[in-house]
Amino acid sequence: MINIRKTHPLMKIVNNAFIDLPAPSNISSWWNFGSLLGICLILQILTGLFLAMHYTPDTTTAFSSVTHICRDVNYGWIIRYMHANGASMFFICLFMHVGRGLYYGSYTFLETWNIGVILLFATMATAFMGYVLPWGQMSFWGATVITNLLSAIPYIGTNLVEWIWGGFSVDKATLTRFFAFHFIFPFIIAALAMVHLLFLHETGSNNPTGIPSDTDKIPFXXXXXIKDILGAILLILILMLLVLFTPDLLGDPDNYTPANPLNTPPHIKPEWYFLFAYAILRSIPNKLGGVLALILSILVLVIMPLLHTSKQRSMMFRPISQCMFWILVADLLTLTWIGGQPVEHPYIIIGQLASIMYFLIILVMMPVASIIENNLLKW
């Protein structure tokens, strides 16, 4: 009898994606992050759904409703903190996943890569809108500062900002629309993730060597599935350690003060996962220039395939490029640190230098390093 797994129209799709999928035999733990991102997304949708049952998107009651969830709803506190820290885990996995793609040359799968960049933007937008919902001080002022950046767009800027606000400032209309968008976006992300996977399965996975692995493939199930489960256990372990021991470690204490349009917090800063981009934004004294640099800092990922000058795909056998890659990682960590610091003497210049370094490494130093390596290998 033919296995139903291989014949049933629905089971067949699942089978070809997660069970009988031919996987390279040498993929390392850096290939775990795709499945971990899927788990993060499911977790965020589920916890978010239960939070939405008790949350009220209204300026007068939003803050109180979050307090009510934490105090009065059964296990509301754990759902709330799983959702908040789940976002941090989501972004850790995202950065690792993108970093893996850069290191091993996975960006040569153009469709998969471009959908991935769109996914990154969508996730960042969702996280930003979610941060506004508790309606604390940092929620309100974060929303004010970031939406205001659109006013830097020539001619239509001011109208655009007021259209997004639904008024002349961040208010009730802004909160309700952000809640609506924050609810719908994860489902759009889930749909895009399926398209991401569809394009990936057209070519098959890359592997650490960057050499085609068609001659040496193994079935996904039992081998890579167990490995994914191990990754998931570790992910949930780290998440629950955060949630149960230090739930507010990554949050901002200002967000425990209800939003007050008349009182600006001394240091407005986003969640830690946006600090690198925030530092790049702040390092340029011009408003429009800063906004462009902010967008380009992420959009630069789209042109990575064009900047690939090496004859090899992966960085596994390219020590100079490896050095460049890890300098870039160090630079991003520096930017993250600077983004959380006040705009004062040593930090301003460090931020500006780190921002210049960021674009210099990606646009100049990495392609040049690749050319040098090609010449050293006489290729």
UniProtKB/Swiss-Prot annotation:
Protein's membrane topology: Multi-pass membrane protein
Compartmental location: Mitochondrion inner membrane
One annotated Gene Ontology cellular component of this protein: respiratory chain complex III
Residues reported in the UniProt entry to bind a ubiquinone: H201
Pfam families noted in UniProt: Cytochrom_B_C (PF00032), Cytochrome_B (PF00033)
Subunit structure: The cytochrome bc1 complex contains 11 subunits: 3 respiratory subunits (MT-CYB, CYC1 and UQCRFS1), 2 core proteins (UQCRC1 and UQCRC2) and 6 low-molecular weight proteins (UQCRH/QCR6, UQCRB/QCR7, UQCRQ/QCR8, UQCR10/QCR9, UQCR11/QCR10 and a cleavage product of UQCRFS1). This cytochrome bc1 complex then forms a dimer.
Protein name per Swiss-Prot or TrEMBL: Cytochrome b
Lineage: Eukaryota, Metazoa, Chordata, Craniata, Vertebrata
Gene: MT-CYB
